[in-house]
Amino acid sequence: MFIDKRMKDWWQATFPKGRQSLVISDAKGYPIQIAYGEKGTGKPLILLHGMGSWSYNWRHSVAALSKYYRVICFDAKGFGFSEKPLSRKEHNGHQVIEFQRIIQALCDEPAVIVAESLGGLVALALAQENPQLIGRLIVVNVPVFAEQLPHWSMWLLAQTPLEVMQTIDSLRLTYLFAPLFREVMAIERRRVLFDPSILTQEDIYWITYPFTELPGTMAKVAEELQIAAREIENWQANKPNMLTKIQNNLSAIKCPTLVLWGEQDSWFPASHGKKLHQHIPNSKLQILSNCCHDASTGASAVLNKTILEFLQETNF
C-alpha cells in the first residue's frame, strides 16, 4: 500500500489511534476485516458512507461531532480499506446484517446513526429490523424512492460482467492510469457539489485512493451496483425486492429521526425527502439550501450544526 509522502495518512491525521481493524462474521458467516477509526468520548455516533465511497467522505464531520460524542467511522465490506472478498458473490441485504454486527461489536448502548445516500438505505432497513441498536437516526439524501441508478457511470459498471471488472482490477489498470482516473473522478465528484471549487487535490487523492491502490475495490463497487440495479428492476417489475420492503415498513421506525436533503440534489430530488418524512412518524425534515447530493462534503458546516441541534432537541 503506497501513500504519497506529500499526503498525510488521513486515518493517522484524523483519529487518535489511526486506522483500527475489527473482524466480524459477514452475512454468509465468513470472518471479514473492517477498517474503522474513532474519536471522542460519550454516546456512540456512527457515520456511514454511501456507494463507492469510504470514511473519508465524513472528513469534515469527525472533529465537530467528536467534541460531544464518541464518533466512529467505518468502511463497509468491499469499500475503502475494508476487506474485499473477490471469490465470494454478495447477496442483497448483506450490508444491513454486517452493519448490525459492527454496531454490536463496537457499541454497548444504542448509537446515533448518521448515514448518507446508500448508507441511509442500509440504516433505514436496520432501524426496521433492529430498533434496539439505534438511539437516534439521521439520514441524508437517501435513494429510498429511487427509480433508476442516478449516474451513467453507475449504469455502465452495473452492465459490465464482473469477470471484466475483476480483470481490470487484477491488471491494476486504475493504478496504471491513476492520473487520468483521478481527473475523471474529480469531474464527476464536482458535479454533485453546489460549489465545485471546494474539492482540493488532496481530496481527489484520497477519494480515489482505494480505487488506484487497493486491488478489488473496482470489482466490489461494480458488484454492489449490480445488486442495486437488480433491486430497481425487480421493483419496476413488481417482483420481491428490498426497496419495496423498506418503503412499506417506514412507519415501523419509532426512534426520533432527522431527514436531511440537499435542495439541489440532482440524483434524488428533495421531494423524496418530504415523502420519506411523511412516512416516518417521529421524524423531522430539513432541506439544506445550496446543497447537492454530496452533503457531507458540500454542506458540512450546516450539516454538523443541524445534527447537533437535533440531538440536543431530542435529549440525546
Which sequence ranges carry the predicted segments?
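Alpha/beta-hydrolase fold catalytic core
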Residues: 1-45, 66-70, 97, 101-109, ...
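Conserved HGGG/HGGXW glycine-rich cap/lid loop of the alpha/beta-hydrolase fold
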Residues: 35-84
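Flexible "cap/lid" loop of the alpha/beta hydrolase fold
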Residues: 128, 137-179
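Conserved alpha/beta-hydrolase catalytic His-Asp/Glu region
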Residues: 175-249
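Acidic catalytic loop of the alpha/beta-hydrolase fold
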Residues: 264-268
